[in-house]
């Protein structure tokens, strides 16, 4: 689907691993696998709902993005969201939720199935049965006419186009909201099903007078704009996640071999901010009291 640029939505409900791991138990261990676990460079959108209400609307957003950008969109949920219950306001139906009508008009002469825009990387999608739209769908490297091609220059053009679609999407996103003040002593960063626990703990700490805020990331690839500025507004930044990270207090661990949690590693690499992490992989949802402590 990545090479052929076919719209596809994949739902990944994470559970305890690796291998058979802990069936039915919660974990957030798939983030890096979803982003980078493929042969070759395969750009895809990764978004993580933080609440059950988010799960509902994320599927609508994911479908729209997949069709607008002809991309794979992964909705990265987890077992705690998949098995929990939560009341939320009844959704008000909108025609924007619907897929646009299928364009069955003849393809104009000279238009190519992979006529990548030089800036955005986007190209028109040809649908089956569209007059003048016959082309080849293949997982092989191909040229703008969908013909298999191993030409070095054409291959780089295709790779660039698929990557630029992520950059194009990123320019349409808004910065993540900050729960609390935008500057202070400590910022707690989370993603996925940890949202409720983090915000409840932060609210309790703020009620006691602590300068603590939090932000929760929905888009993990591409990341939303403005994150770097948010991180730099705090003296300390820490992620709270349900995946493994080494304990810096372990006698074997130092900065040359410490494994950081998935999101902490991504934030450190992209924004060059000293992001620390706290993690728990007990197979159960992280509790507000644990974050508070």
Predicted regions and their residues:
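Short, conserved catalytic or adaptor-binding loops enriched in Gly and charged residues
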Residues: 33-40, 267-271
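Flexible, low-complexity linker and terminal segments
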Residues: 58, 63-293
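A broadly conserved detector of short glycine/acidic/proline-rich loop/turn motifs that flank catalytic sites
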Residues: 12-15, 38, 50-51, 79-80, ...
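Glycine- and acidic
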Residues: 41-48, 183-186
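Thiamine diphosphate
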Residues: 1-36, 45-66, 207
């Amino acid at each position: 689907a990545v090479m052929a640029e076919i719209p596809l939505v994949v739902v990944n409900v994470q559970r305890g691993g690796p291998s058979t791991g802990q069936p039915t138990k919660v974990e957030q261990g798939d983030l890096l696998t979803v982003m980078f676990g493929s042969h070759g460079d395969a750009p895809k959108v990764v978004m993580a709902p933080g609440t059950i209400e988010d799960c509902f609307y994320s599927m609508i957003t994911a479908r729209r993005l997949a069709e607008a950008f002809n991309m794979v969109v992964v909705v990265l949920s987890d077992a705690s969201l998949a098995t929990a219950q939560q009341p939320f306001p009844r959704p008000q139906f909108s025609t924007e939720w619907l897929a646009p009508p299928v364009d069955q008009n003849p393809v104009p002469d000279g238009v190519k199935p992979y006529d990548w825009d030089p800036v955005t990387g986007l190209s028109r999608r040809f649908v089956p049965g569209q007059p003048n739209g016959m082309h080849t769908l293949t997982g092989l490297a191909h040229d703008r006419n969908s013909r298999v091609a191993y030409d070095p220059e054409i291959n780089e053009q295709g790779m660039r186009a698929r990557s630029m679609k992520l950059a194009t999407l990123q320019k349409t996103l808004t910065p993540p909201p900050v729960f609390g003040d935008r500057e202070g002593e400590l910022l707690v960063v989370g993603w996925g099903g940890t949202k409720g626990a983090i915000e409840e703990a932060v609210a309790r700490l703020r009620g006691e007078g602590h300068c603590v805020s939090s932000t929760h990331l929905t888009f993990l690839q591409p990341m939303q704009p403005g994150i770097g500025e948010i991180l730099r507004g705090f003296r300390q930044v820490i992620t709270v996640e349900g995946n493994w990270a080494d304990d810096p207090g372990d006698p074997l661990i130092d900065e040359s071999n410490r494994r950081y949690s998935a999101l902490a590693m991504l934030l450190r690499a992209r924004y060059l901010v000293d992001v620390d992490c706290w993690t728990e992989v007990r197979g159960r949802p992280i509790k507000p009291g644990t974050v508070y402590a």
